[in-house]
Structure formats: structure tokens, C-alpha cells
Curated annotation (Swiss-Prot):
Protein name (database record): Ferredoxin
Binding sites annotated in the UniProt record for [4Fe-4S] cluster 1: C9, C12, C15, C48
Membrane-spanning parts: none
Keyword annotations of the record: 4Fe-4S, Electron transport, Iron, Iron-sulfur, Metal-binding, Repeat, Transport
Binding site for [4Fe-4S] cluster 2: C19, C38, C41, C44
Source organism per UniProt: Clostridium pasteurianum
Length: 56
């Protein structure tokens, strides 16, 4: 089960730098996670200051 980034994302980029498989990239207004690449490690959720990454 992959993570997704909720609308509460503040685009700080903390999650992207912690992703070991580079599944997170900047979208139009918030960061997005490629579900096919995500390995469900939870690093993004652990570092996000607003709790935007959530499991799908």
C-alpha cells in the first residue's frame, strides 16, 4: 500500500529528500508520490511537519 500526499502539503520538500527511492516530486501545487515506485517505508510521513503523507 503506497503513500499519497494530502492537500495539507505546504510544499516544503522535506519528504522528497528523505525518500530512498525518489518516488516524490514537486507537482503543480503540492508534492506527489509515484505509487508504483513507493516502497511504503514511511520516511516521508515521519519527517513531514504537517502530516501530509498518508497511506492509501
Amino acid at each position: 500500500m503506497a503513500y499519497k500526499i494530502a492537500d495539507s502539503c505546504v510544499s516544503c520538500g522535506a519528504c522528497a529528500s528523505e525518500c530512498p527511492v525518489n518516488a516524490i516530486s514537486q507537482g503543480d501545487s503540492i508534492f506527489v508520490i509515484d505509487a508504483d515506485t513507493c516502497i511504503d517505508c514511511g520516511n516521508c510521513a515521519n519527517v513531514c511537519p504537517v502530516g501530509a503523507p498518508v497511506q492509501e
